[in-house]
């Protein structure tokens, strides 16, 4: 039974992780800037083993006090959505740099750390599927769109250096498009947005020409992957992709959602320049290689895309399909 600290704990992935940790009889502290009210993903959680702390990872005194009392630390705090990254690149970078700075200064060898990185660090790397050891190609510094990827990659470098220099047990997971119940469509995630449009009976909007491809990982699979990495010491000091290898174009995704909800709905193609701020750049293909995590832990994703879409739809419609 471990004492676990989860930053970004009220978020989409964090709330699912916390539910699982509590089911496994761990004590959990969630740190998040979100207020504690009925819109919080954890509001209905009732457990004497759970504590919620409203605050920021940039509050060094608060964060360090929570670090020192934890056995396991899950660093999930991040800026969500490409639009928000472009609008606030400095805040985006600070969220990552601040928490890693305090981890490097405070963490001890008796603790274990999971860092939630992102497929964004692969940038413009034109290879498919993407393997963890590839050389990485990011966009030009003048494009604010790359602030998230650069700050996440810097955090990876610092944490892996911490492992090499001080032998702090840690692992890095690069998430690829995690989806599922509780995901907030306000941050621009494509599946909850398309499903919400379909439920409302309005045209489904696809940005660009729709040929860009992605793969989508159910949040329960992502939680399983995190725990499999944290529970296996042979994974320490390395980076692992976490995702699903089932690739689909965004246009075909919209077609699939239309067929699922209402085949009569229109699909509208919208140019990027009509909806995205200056500095946006699209990535045409992003699909993970999952061989490494399977080799080290035996983990592989269980949910197929059709199952994931149904699960998201049930959540959005109040469990009625």
Give the ranges of each region predicted by the language model.
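Hydrophobic "lid"/C-terminal helical patch
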Residues: 17, 226-230, 254-257, 309-316
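Residue-level signal for the nucleotide or nucleotide-sugar donor/cofactor binding architecture
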Residues: 58, 87, 95-98, 185-189, ...
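Conserved C-terminal active-site "lid" loop/helix of NAD(P)H-dependent oxidoreductases
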Residues: 219, 273-300, 304, 311
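Glycine/proline-rich active-site loop of Rossmann-fold NAD(P)-dependent oxidoreductases
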Residues: 153, 169, 178-192, 202, ...
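N-terminal Rossmann-like NAD(P)+-binding domain of SDR-like oxidoreductases, especially those catalyzing
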Residues: 1-176, 312-315
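Mid/C-terminal beta-alpha module of Rossmann-like enzyme folds, strongest
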Residues: 232-277
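Amphipathic terminal alpha-helices
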Residues: 3, 304-321
